[in-house]
Amino acid sequence: MLHRAGDREEARNRLTALWHEIGPQGDAFHRCALAHYMADTQDDPRDELDWDLRALEAAEGFVTERPDNAAPGASSVADGPGPRHPLVALRAFFPSLHLNIAADYAALDRPADAHAQLRRARASINALADGAYRQGLRDAIDRLQLRIDGAAGRMA
């Protein structure tokens, strides 16, 4: 992706065009994934938080208002990329979404909100199958927890 190669502005421009194409009533899975990527292209932590919250809103809306013809979701998802039902794929986003939102709150010096999101990330990680992705998220949650707690300790 462009933003990982250092061209955040061009990535933002292209993702914004896609966002307008999908629209607010577009497919929740696509809105979630796109907003999740869009957050990573932001320079301002408040904007990053706004996009991460949009991604979470799309995911939560889809999970709670699942289409009648959707296949029942499995209790866990496969480790890594691969085809799966969008509901299951969206459930796999929750730990990462909550982790990103926690990081956004930490960047905005809102440790209580960050801690609340870390708790949600830990609670939602059980939807993932054991494997490298799940362990990587657990490690990232632990690192952010230590960083937030360390910052709070320096302020006391």
What are these regions (language model features)?
Residues 20-26, 60-90, 127-131:
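Flexible helix-coil transition and linker loops at the boundaries of alpha-helical arrays
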Residues 1-13:
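Alpha-helical segment of the N-proximal tetratricopeptide repeat
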Residues 31-35, 98, 117:
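TPR repeat positional signature
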Residues 34-37, 93, 100, 139-147:
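"A position-specific structural signal for the A-helix of alpha-solenoid helical repeats
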Residues 5, 42-45, 108:
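Structural motif corresponding to the intra-repeat A-B loop/turn of tetratricopeptide repeats
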Residues 50-61, 109-129:
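TPR/TPR-like (Sel1-like) alpha-helical repeat modules
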Residues 1, 38-41, 97, 104:
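Residue-level signature for tetratricopeptide repeat
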Residues 11, 24-31, 48, 87-90, ...:
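Residues that mark the junctions of alpha-helical repeat units in TPR/alpha-solenoid scaffolds
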